[in-house]
Amino acid sequence: MLCDVYRSSKKADTYLYLPHGNEFTDVPDVLLGQFGRAEKVLTINLANREQLARLTVEKLQQHLHNDGFYLQLPPKREELQVNVNK
């Protein structure tokens, strides 16, 4: 399965994952308004991976299948501090 990844023009470190070729039809208008202009950054072949930076490919595929998209938000400040201290 191919997946397109878009970066938000309004929110730093915020990404929207969509099935390849999807025209944002499953993304709520409110979310698109807050997301801003979507800049495509890459296309990922999920068949070649098990893990992404913040979630498993299995979880991502579940979101894409059930919701039609996945919104990746920046990690919370506490999560960053824990990762730095490891």
From Swiss-Prot:
Domain YcgL: residue ranges = 1-85
Signal peptide (UniProt feature, chain positions): none
Domain of life (superkingdom) = Bacteria
A Pfam family this chain is assigned to: YcgL
Record-linked InterPro entries:
YcgL-like_sf, YcgL_dom
User: What's the protein called, per UniProt?
Assistant: YcgL domain-containing protein IL1825
